UniProtKB/Swiss-Prot annotation:
One example of a Gene Ontology biological process annotation: regulation of fatty acid metabolic process
Organism name: Arabidopsis thaliana
Cross-referenced PANTHER family: TRANSMEMBRANE PROTEIN 14 HOMOLOG, TRANSMEMBRANE PROTEIN 14, 15
Entry's family note: Belongs to the TMEM14 family.
Protein name, as recorded: Protein FATTY ACID EXPORT 3, chloroplastic
């Protein structure tokens, strides 16, 4: 224990004489705590000077003790900052290691993905080539089979068509023998032209008879259904006239006479029908049926013009005499 005289207290307290006079004893004691009760370096408690007086207790801290406390606190804070710096450095190094590890894992994943993609591409290309070859083989075989079947069907249809045409011709000839003379002439004329395959071998009545009959029947049906007056004028009247002129041309042809005048009459009727249908078509008042009629009448008119040019190129008619074998097998004799 240390004892401090009370005279030293006069520096801090001017009235210390009173205290000295009243109590010259006991001395001031400096109480230091036991060594075992001292805290760690971070928390340091300095000894305090205690002045005992009856009913009053004074205490103060020594300046040296305060200085030591600040030094200890600075050292503790320096140690804490050092430890925190070490911990931050360790955390940074751990983060860098983790980044490197993640980059390596990402690179490995990309490499494996590229390998898988390349394998899939190679497999898909091989499969595509194999499948394409198989498909081409199957298509070739299928096309060959279809071609063979088409040829067989064509041959069968041609055979059946010939049989049907022969049977139909025989039936028509038998029916014509029992029919009136006009019908018989028409049937014989159409049966002797070899199905009208060659346009140059066909005569004007080969086209005028069916076309005039079509106009006649079609105009009559149109008038009965719709009551149209043009159907009577351009269908029944002109169609009937065309049919009659074609029959006259057929009879003159069988007799060996010239049929040029009948050809001109048929051409005039067809020209009237064609111009009328063309006018309706250009004025946008015609339907699909009108377009078909215009196309048909134009084709018939072109055929008549062709036959007229052919007749003019042949020169004089047979009315002047001589013989000429027509395209339908009839022989014209001298008039």
């Amino acid at each position: 224990m240390m004892s401090i005289p009370m005279e030293l207290m006069s520096i801090r307290n001017p009235n210390s004489t009173l205290l000295y006079r009243a109590h010259s004893r006991p001395p001031v004691k400096l109480c230091a705590p036991p060594r075992s009760l001292l805290p760690s370096r971070r928390h340091f408690s300095a000894p305090r000077a205690v002045v005992s007086y009856p009913g009053i207790r004074f205490g103060f801290t020594s300046p040296e003790v305060l200085l030591n406390r600040s030094v200890v606190a600075f050292a503790a804070s320096h140690e804490d900052s050092g430890e925190s710096g070490v911990e931050v450095g360790k955390e940074k190094s751990d983060i860098d290691v983790e980044d490197d590890t993640s980059k390596e894992a990402w690179k490995q994943t990309l490499e494996s993905f590229k390998e898988q993609v390349s394998k899939m591409q190679s497999v898909s290309s091989e499969a595509y080539s194999v499948n394409s070859q198989k498909a081409m083989t199957v298509l070739k075989e299928t096309s060959e089979q279809l071609r063979i079947q088409a040829e067989k069907a064509k041959e069968e249809l041609g055979t059946k068509a010939k049989v049907v045409s022969e049977e139909g011709r025989e039936y028509i000839l038998k029916a014509a023998e029992e029919s009136p003379s006009d019908v018989k002439e028409i049937v014989e004329a159409f049966a002797s032209t070899e199905d009208l395959k060659n346009v140059s071998r066909a005569n004007d009545f080969h086209v005028g008879i069916p076309y005039g009959l079509l106009l006649l029947v079609g105009g009559f049906i149109n008038f009965m259904v719709s009551g149209s007056i043009p159907a009577i004028r351009f269908g029944v009247i002109l169609g009937g006239a065309l049919f009659a002129l074609s029959l006259a041309s057929l009879k003159s042809h069988r007799k060996g006479e010239s049929s040029t005048k009948f050809l001109k009459g048929q051409m005039a009727i067809v020209a009237i029908i064609f111009l009328r249908e063309l006018r309706l078509l250009l004025s946008q008042k015609s339907t699909f049926l009108g377009f078909f009629t215009t196309l048909t009448s134009g084709g018939v008119l072109g055929f008549y013009l062709y036959k007229m040019v052919v007749k003019r190129e042949k020169g004089p008619t047979l009315e002047d005499g001589g013989e000429d074998e027509s395209s339908d097998g009839f022989v014209r004799s001298e008039g």
